């Protein structure tokens, strides 16, 4: 009877923990979206809109190592880094906007996933080699972290791809309603309010957005094979957190005397962190989503400080993998300097950077390719480079006056740069 009471208590606790995680994850994602939607008015009032970008330890390390200087603005990243030592990969399951996006899309792809019998490579160690590749490239002198940092990817996805298409869809919908007189007297004020409060006056258009559309589409549709495929196998930030999770105070432990090996936790684990028996767990792969604890009908799952050694599955890394990553970085990084555009006689590229940009070499080193400056540009004049700044400068911002001029009274792009690649300017100084 006593065991049954304890089991019921643990079951309720697991369900509560899971619901708390869902609420926190939803609120954090809503905050991320709101900061993107209301970036303009918040930045106008000197508010902080780049907090998520400054929370990425990977971006912080990338910008500081490449620029060879300490960037104080990345203090949130250090808090996350220290917290990950004690809490494991909590950031991936509770905070990361790309992870939340994949949770949403994976649920939409659930039926399709069950219909696909063919499986692709599911190698969790691959992300560690990608991390090694990126870190070595920094010491060689090239900043590639921004291309694969999940926070930068999320910001770009919603700024360059999703937001423009969403605005166009909303405008088309209200344009259709405008044709009906008895509806338009209500729909027109609503449309005007949405334009003023939520969207740009005109749908923004970004050159080269199709490239990022392909990138985010591939990341999403890999979910047809495995849930959170990006997080499992490719995310370098997740690899960094996994390396720190060995000291976590929340580790999955299974009561062997209670577990009936139903295998449900293994099937439902979105990270593939649980083995076929349901008893063993890769601590570095667990993102503390708490679902295994919530669905366990025998209440055998707990999260505690210590994990029995027989229940721990170590990271299976190979020397060959690391050597391959290092050699690849040494070969690929220098190739990024290949130029595809003619330069001026002084050797400078024929591109215009945003106002307040630091010298070009430092700019490339510090810029994390997040697209935040493009999001707040009122005239849609800032666009990502493709090959205009060589491969090493791909996806850094450039001003294209033919598309949108630089407004004399606007300094928003100088207020939202998380890394300091664009320094703050007053309107008078500009």
How should these model regions be labeled?
Residues 2-279, 284-430:
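Non-ligating segments of multi-cofactor redox enzymes
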């Amino acid at each position: 009877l006593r065991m049954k009471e304890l089991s019921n208590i643990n079951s309720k606790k697991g369900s509560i923990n899971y619901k708390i995680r869902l609420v926190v994850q939803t609120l954090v994602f809503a905050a991320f979206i709101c900061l993107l939607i209301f970036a303009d008015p918040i930045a106008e009032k000197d508010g902080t809109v780049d907090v998520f970008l400054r929370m990425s330890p990977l971006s912080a390390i990338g910008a500081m190592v490449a620029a060879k200087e300490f960037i104080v603005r990345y203090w949130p990243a250090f808090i996350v880094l220290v917290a990950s030592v004690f809490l494991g990969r909590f950031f991936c399951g509770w905070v990361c906007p790309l992870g939340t996006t994949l949770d949403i899309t994976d649920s939409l792809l659930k039926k399709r996933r069950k219909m696909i019998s063919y499986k692709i490579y599911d190698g969790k160690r691959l992300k560690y080699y990608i991390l090694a590749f990126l870190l070595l490239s920094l010491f060689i002198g090239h900043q590639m972290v921004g291309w694969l940092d999940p926070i930068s990817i999320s910001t770009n996805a919603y700024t360059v791809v999703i937001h423009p298409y969403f605005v166009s869809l909303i405008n088309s919908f209200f344009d259709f309603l405008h044709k009906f007189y008895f509806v338009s007297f209500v729909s027109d004020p609503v449309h005007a309010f949405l334009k003023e409060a939520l969207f740009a006056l005109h749908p923004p258009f970004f050159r080269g957005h199709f490239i990022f559309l392909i990138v985010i589409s591939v990341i999403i549709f890999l979910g047809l094979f495995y849930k959170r495929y990006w997080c499992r196998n490719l995310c370098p930030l997740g690899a960094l957190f996994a390396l720190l999770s060995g000291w976590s105070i929340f580790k999955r432990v299974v009561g062997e005397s209670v577990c009936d090996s139903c295998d449900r936790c293994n099937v439902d684990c979105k990270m593939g962190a649980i083995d076929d028996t349901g008893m063993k767990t890769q601590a570095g792969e667990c993102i503390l989503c708490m679902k295994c604890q919530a669905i366990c009908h025998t209440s055998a799952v707990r999260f505690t400080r210590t994990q029995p050694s027989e229940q721990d599955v170590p990271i299976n890394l190979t020397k060959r993998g690391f050597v391959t990553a290092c050699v690849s970085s040494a070969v690929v990084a220098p190739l990024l300097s290949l130029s595809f555009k003619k330069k001026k006689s002084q050797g400078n590229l024929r591109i215009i950077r945003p106002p307040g940009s630091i010298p070009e070499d430092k700019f490339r080193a510090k810029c994390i390719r997040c697209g935040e400056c493009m999001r707040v540009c009122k005239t849609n004049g800032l666009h990502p480079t493709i090959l205009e700044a060589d491969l090493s400068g791909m996806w850094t911002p450039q001003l294209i006056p033919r598309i949108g001029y630089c407004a004399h009274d606007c300094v928003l792009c100088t207020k939202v740069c998380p890394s300091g690649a664009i320094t703050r300017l007053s309107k008078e100084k500009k």
